[in-house]
Amino acid sequence: ILFVARVLNWNDKYLPSQTQYTDEYDFESSCCLSRARYDYIYKCKVDNERYRTNGATYRWCRAGRKASKYIKKHVQEIKIPVLLCQAGKDTLVSNTAEDEFIAKLPQGTKKVYPDSKHEIFNADDDTLEKFYSDILDFWA
């Protein structure tokens, strides 16, 4: 489908179920666990267009696939410590693919936040405290 989209010059068209930014309030289906943090970011997005994000386009998807293929091919060349923070309830990123990636790294460390959605940095206070502690401990 990405090839067809390229031939038809759909580079900037949104993928199915993806759209440009709207100011629709939808905490329940967001990638955020903390309503307070969601509300804060929501207000920032409404008030300032620089905070706004759009859905994925065919161009974005092609670039992501290209980057993923490159990383898979060159994973053994990564010689630095890598911390992978994995959201247990992520619906945007494949935890299986992340597991395969981190397992191939000689200095790979994985931390899982089982109750978190994609935006771990917008999780509940307990998860966020562990998340930041894990990051600081990793670099200590």
Task: Report each predicted region and the residues it spans.
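Short alpha-helix in the alpha/beta-hydrolase fold that links the catalytic acid
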Residues: 80, 94-103
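Catalytic active-site module of serine/aspartate enzymes centered on a nucleophile-bearing elbow/loop
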Residues: 108-140
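Short beta-strand/loop motif that positions the catalytic acidic residue
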Residues: 78, 84-86, 90
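Short glycine/threonine-rich loop-to-helix capping motif typified by GTGT followed
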Residues: 93-94, 125
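Glycine-/small-residue-rich active-site loops that bind phosphorylated ligands and cofactors
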Residues: 52, 90, 127
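Active-site nucleophile elbow and catalytic-triad environment of alpha/beta-hydrolase enzymes
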Residues: 52-74
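Alpha/beta-hydrolase-fold enzymes
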Residues: 1-52
